[in-house]
Amino acid sequence: MSPHQFRKLVSPVYVVFFAALSLSAASLQAQSPATTAAVTDYVKAEMQRQHIPGLSLLVAKNGKIVRAEGFGVANVELQVPVKPETIFQSGSVGKQFTATAVMMLVEEGKVGLGDPLTKYFKDAPASWKEVTVRELLSHTAGFGDYPKSFNFRKDWTEHELLKLVEGIPLLYAPGTKWKYSNFGFLTLGILIHRVTGEFYGDFLQQRIFHTLDMNSTRIISEADIIPNRAAGYRLVKGELKNQEWVAPMVNTTADGSLYFSILDLAKWDAALYTEKLLKRSSLDQMWTVAKLKNGQPNKGPYGFGWFIDQRNGHRCIHHDGSWQGFETAIDRYVDDQLTVVALTNLAGAQPGKITQHVAEMYLADK
């Protein structure tokens, strides 16, 4: 999710103070000392250039941690350093978990990718009869996004959110174009609830997070006491400000409302090399660019919950996220079995730039 009122970034003149030394590095595989030093220097330089208070970096190879390290501070006011256990908000990196949950239900025969949405939403507009689950997963359904008038501080009910989505006309005929839509994934979360009887976050907790021992990963709650939770920030006219929170319900939707750490994401990454959660055929389908009705690949290019690209000859599935003073990115070079994750606590930061450059350094160090 990326509502504009929470992402606006003015050209900064204020330099955020952050700890000069990185903390708690975990190194479980051999790596070139030169690459290690170069990555450290690059990350610190980018943090200073982008004015990022804190960053958590994961590099994994063959499903094993190469580097799990914190830089800077998780809380500026208290000067709490970032460490591998520090918990950040996911933003839209959470969409891959939603897509995985839907594919679990597909494998169990409870959901069909070609099913029309009206199978699950009986009171939906007639136009939804032409929209399939597959099209929601790939952002080709014609769904829009949060309108500018959306009140993020109203504590919506799930029913109210669904009625809001249903009331917005489709932007194009389903399956004919690609347009990124948070509302599409929000609707998938409600679909999961209707099919299983379990709230989206509870389904993820039981079927994914518990299965993989992702003990710090969960739905966002500002009310709960969350050990190791980072604070989110934004820059306003060059001055660092605390992020202002949204209503509780808006922090529980399936378009990207999770807490996690890089250590938990390392477990997630390792599981994607196995069939612990899904069959290989299901994962391959998620990581293949979905086709439009004319047989052409969509212009995302997007699969189910993942962007799919070629970067300098290397296949990369990836996603970034933006929400409430946090920016995140995960890049998985699946054929090279290399994964790089960067979690940051500044709205408008560019963690995807960092993950891509760090990956290039490791790919060059073969």
Q: How should each PLM-predicted stretch be described?
A:
Residues 40-43, 57, 63, 87-114, ...:
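Active-site SXXK
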